[in-house]
Amino acid sequence: VDDRELIARVRDGDPGAERLLYDRHVDRVYRLAYRMTGDDDLARDYTQETFIRAFERLEQFRGEAALGTWIQAIAGTVVLNGLRKVKRFRTREVELDESLAHGVSPRAPEPDLKEQLEQAIDDLPDKYRMVFVMHDVEGYTHEEIGSALGMPVGTSKAQLFRARARLRDALSDFAEEWAS
């Protein structure tokens, strides 16, 4: 059963078709959400929200892009908006923690390369991180990224270049320490 037939069946109210469509695309949506958040609970929440929105808006799907690309575009929006909310909450949480802190906290151990890389990716601006994860981690083409995120292919390429440059800069100190 192809996606077009599934869409027609979902529009006709077939719950089995909804489940099949969900099963066909859920892994890719979850992987993107997890790679962007690093948090299983948030990734599951964003995956669920993505499919709620996709099913609510299925009537608007025109078939100009592949269904999977359309769903990934929704996922990208859901994740980026969700991360903005989480970031605002965590910023307030840190400010509160700092206002309650007394004295000097013990020094944390130096992170290893994996932790450094994860932190460097987390520190990227949201759009750079999304393009980096979609291209270098998930294997999307720039055309698919452009379609999913509503940007020209050249913008996707430029953002990937900038993301990689920031990661190189962020990891250069670690590389110098390790080499000496």
Summary of predicted features, one role per range:
Residues R31, D45-I52, E56, A65-T77:
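Structural recognition of an alpha-helix C-terminal capping motif at a helix-to-coil junction
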Residues V1-D3, N81, F89-K114, T141:
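Internal acidic/polar
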Residues Y22-D40, R57, I121, D173:
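Amphipathic, Lys/Arg- and hydrophobic-enriched alpha-helical face
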Residues L80, R84, Y128, V137, ...:
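DNA-recognition helix of helix-turn-helix
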Residues R9, T91, K114-A120, V133, ...:
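C-terminal edge and immediately downstream basic/flexible tail or linker adjoining helix-turn-helix-like DNA-binding
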Residues R44, D122, D126-M130, M134, ...:
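Helix-turn-helix DNA-binding module
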Residues E56-G63, A73-V94, E110, D173:
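Arg/Lys-rich amphipathic alpha helix in sigma70-family domain 2
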Residues I7-R31:
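A short, charge-rich alpha-helical start-of-domain segment used by transcription regulators
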